[in-house]
Amino acid sequence: MSGTPILRVERLTREAFAPFGDVIALEGARHFPINGGTTERFHDLATIDVCADGGRPLVSVFRAQPRAVPVAITLMERHPHGSQAFIPLAAVSRYAIVVAPAGEFRPDAMRAFLAEGWQGVNYAKGVWHHPLLALDAVSDFVIVDRGGPQPNCDEIPLECAWALEFEPACAGAEGLS
């Protein structure tokens, strides 16, 4: 992939992902016991923003096929009327995330993250992102996003394909570059 622009993949953390939305994870989350102490509630993990302009929340399941590495990033999409959350159903598979800030798309502002199977993400309204990038296995995700009368998905092709480069600091990144 000589001459191909490279996007370095970093480990997904709440702090690094904050400009794009929320990391949905139990680690570091506010929690408290409920139901007579038999259940622990991890509370308010993401800001779901879907109700403006007659929108309503939808819950769906996406089944993602694993992508072959190297992964070519050729398009981005955004949801201008609502947020979109991805919550893995099994904590065994990693997935890659490519995002860019809301507003006019700028390829030089893209960032990439490696999510562990126990981490979900919630893209804020209007944030550019690549479609789901499962890496290790067929992976099921619960999706919370917006239903409503307006179209809610804008896609743009990239002028050239970008390649993901997985940093060694990403736990278990060996075998992904």
Swiss-Prot record:
Keywords: Lyase, Purine metabolism. The keyword S-adenosyl-L-methionine does not apply. Its EC number is 4.3.2.3. It catalyses: (S)-ureidoglycolate = urea + glyoxylate. Its cofactor is Ni(2+). It holds the Pfam family Ureidogly_lyase. This is Ureidoglycolate lyase. The gene is allA.
